C-alpha cells in the first residue's frame, strides 16, 4: 500500500525514506529465510482469500444474544406490595424482599439475555410463592448500568439468604440453574456453604 502511494507521488520525503528502509529490511529478512518477498506476499494473500471463501458468513459473525423468559408479561409488570419491606443495593442491582413471608415454598424466576452460554444481562428477577404472590425482586438500577453474571449470582445469594432466614424453601428456575448458577442441588437451588448462609442471614438481620 505504501509503495502504491510512493508510485503515485503522494508521499513526502520522510515517508519515502521510511519506505526505502523497510524495503531494504524486508529484502534482508527474505535473503536470510531464503524467500522471495513478492512471491511470499502473494502466497499469503491467496491463503487469506481461501480461508475467507471457505468460512461461511455465519462462522465469522459474533454470536447473537438470546432472550430467555421465565416470566410472562403479566408477571413482569404486576405491582406488588411488602408488609415488611427490605431493600438492599448490591453494586448495580437492587434487591427487595418481604420479610413478613414465612414457611413458604418459593421459586425464583427471571427474564434475561444469554451469550456464550452465560447470563449476559438481567432484565428482572422475581420470587414467587406457590400461590403466585410476589415476595422478592432483583432489578438493575437505571442509574448504574452494567453488571456481570457474578453480580447477579451474588445478588441471588443475598435474596435466598434473606428468604431462608424466615424458614422459606427457595429454589431457582431451570433457566437460572443452567445459565446463572451452573450447579444446583437436588432441590433445584444452588448449594450454599453453611458459613455463607449464616453470614448472609446475619447481614440481613443486622440491617433490619
Swiss-Prot record:
Upon interferon induction, ISGylated via host HERC5; this results in the impairment of NS1 interaction with RNA targets due to its inability to form homodimers and to interact with host EIF2AK2/PKR. SUPFAM superfamilies: Ns1 effector domain-like, S15/NS1 RNA-binding domain. GO terms for cellular component: host cell cytoplasm; host cell nucleus. Coiled coil: none annotated. Residues 158-193 are annotated as: CPSF4-binding. Residues 184-208 are annotated as: Disordered. Homodimer. Interacts with host TRIM25 (via coiled coil); this interaction specifically inhibits TRIM25 multimerization and TRIM25-mediated RIGI CARD ubiquitination. Interacts with human EIF2AK2/PKR, CPSF4, IVNS1ABP and PABPN1. Inhibits post-transcriptional processing of cellular pre-mRNA, by binding and inhibiting two cellular proteins that are required for the 3'-end processing of cellular pre-mRNAs: the 30 kDa cleavage and polyadenylation specificity factor/CPSF4 and the poly(A)-binding protein 2/PABPN1. In turn, unprocessed 3' end pre-mRNAs accumulate in the host nucleus and are no longer exported to the cytoplasm. Cellular protein synthesis is thereby shut off very early after virus infection. The dsRNA-binding region is required for suppression of RNA silencing. Belongs to the influenza A viruses NS1 family. This is Non-structural protein 1. It comes from Influenza A virus (strain A/Teal/China/2978.1/2002 H5N1 genotype W).
Amino acid at each position: 500500500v505504501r509503495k502504491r502511494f510512493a508510485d503515485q507521488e503522494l508521499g513526502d520525503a520522510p515517508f519515502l525514506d521510511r519506505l526505502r528502509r523497510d524495503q531494504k529490511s524486508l529484502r534482508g529478512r527474505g535473503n536470510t529465510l531464503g524467500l522471495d518477498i513478492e512471491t511470499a506476499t502473494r502466497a499469503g494473500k491467496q491463503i487469506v482469500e481461501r480461508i475467507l471463501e471457505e468460512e461461511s458468513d455465519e462462522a465469522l459473525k459474533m454470536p447473537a444474544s438470546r432472550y430467555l423468559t421465565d416470566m410472562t408479561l403479566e408477571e413482569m409488570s404486576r405491582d406488588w406490595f411488602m408488609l415488611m419491606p427490605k431493600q438492599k443495593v448490591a453494586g448495580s442491582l437492587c434487591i427487595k424482599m418481604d420479610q413478613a413471608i414465612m414457611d413458604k415454598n418459593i421459586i425464583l424466576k427471571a427474564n434475561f439475555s444469554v451469550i456464550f452460554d452465560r447470563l449476559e444481562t438481567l432484565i428482572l428477577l422475581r420470587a414467587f410463592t406457590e400461590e403466585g404472590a410476589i415476595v422478592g425482586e432483583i432489578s438493575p438500577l437505571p442509574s448504574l448500568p452494567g453488571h456481570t453474571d457474578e453480580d447477579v449470582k451474588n445478588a441471588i445469594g443475598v435474596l435466598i439468604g434473606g428468604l431462608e432466614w424466615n424458614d422459606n424453601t427457595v429454589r431457582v428456575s431451570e433457566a437460572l440453574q443452567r445459565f446463572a448458577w451452573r450447579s444446583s442441588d437436588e432441590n433445584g437451588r444452588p448449594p450454599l456453604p453453611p458459613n455463607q448462609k449464616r453470614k448472609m442471614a446475619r447481614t440481613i438481620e443486622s440491617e433490619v
